[in-house]
Amino acid sequence: MTVAGCDIYHPSQSLLTGEEITFCGNISRSLKKDNYLVLETQAQGNIAWLPYPGQLRLQAYSHIANGSNSVMYWHWHSIHNAIESYWKGVLSHDFSENETYREAASIGADWKRIGTHLKNLQKKNRAAILLDNNSLTGLRLFPLKDLGNYSYNTVARWLGDALYHLNIEYDMISSAERDFSSYECLIVPALYSASEDLLTAISDSVKNGGHLITTFRSGFSDEQLKIYADTQPHILQECLGIHYDQYTYPVDVSVTLPDFMAHPSCSGHENAASDAGSSCSDESCTNSSKCLHWMDLVTCDTATPLFFYDHPVWKKYAAATVNQFGKG
C-alpha cells in the first residue's frame, strides 16, 4: 500500500462530536505514518444525519486537520432504487441544487484558492494509542458484559475520545512495534492478547522514562489467546505495581472520584482546588460514577490506589492506581 485511504461516517446534527473523525483519521494517518485520503464520507447521509448548515464545512476542515489530503463524498446524487435509496448524496433525487450542494461547492472553491497550504499537513504527537487485532479477536470470543463484538473497540474509543475532549492529539501504533521512545505517553487499551516480547517492550519503555496508561484485560493471554499461567497482569505486574487473580462483572458497584478527576471544569471544583481539603461547592455535581462491563479485583503492591470500589464486598480492591517504575 502506497497511500492509506478510509471511509469515515458518523452521526450529525446535535450528535456531531468530531470524535469519529479524529479516531478514524488517526488510524488512517498512522497506517503509513503519513497523509491519507478520505475516500468516502457522508454528504446528506442517512435521514437522521442531514447536516445542519455549516456542519459540512466543519467536518471537511476536521478531516484536513487530521492529515487527510482529500474529502470525497458518497455520493454525487441520491440513487433512485435499491438498498441505499435513502443514503443521500450531495444532490437529492431531483438532481437540483440544495443547501448541501451549495456548501460543498463553497468548500471546493475555498480549497481551489488555498488548497496548496492545506496539503500534506504534518503532526508530531507525543501520545500514542497501541492497537492490536488479536486482542480485538480475543474480546469478541470472551467479551465484556453487554458489549459483545464491540468490546475491544469500545474500550479503545473510551481512551481516544477522552484524549480528544482533553485536546490531546495522538497517533495510533501497531502492536507489531517495539520502539515507543518517540512518545512520552503510551496508551494501551484492553491488550488481552500479547506476546512476551511486546509486554517486555512496554515495561521497558516505562522503566526508561515513558508514561503508560493501560486498562483491565491487559497482559492476560499470549498471541494464540492462551491464558498466561502466572499472576496477572503477565510481565506488567512489576511495572504497574499491582496484581490480581480474580475479576467479575460489576453489579451495583460505583466509585467515588477525587474532586480533581470528577468534573475539573465546573466552578465548584475550581473553588475546592483553591481551598485545600474542601469538596465541590456545586450541589448539582457528583463525584460518583457507576462501574460497567468489567472489574479486575486489584491489589496494590508498590502502586498507590487512586480510588476504590464503593461496594460492601469489593471495597478493599483498587479501581485505579498509579505507580512509579524505573524512570517512568
Regions found by a protein language model. Give the residues of each.
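Carbohydrate-binding surfaces of carbohydrate-active enzymes
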Residues: T2-G328
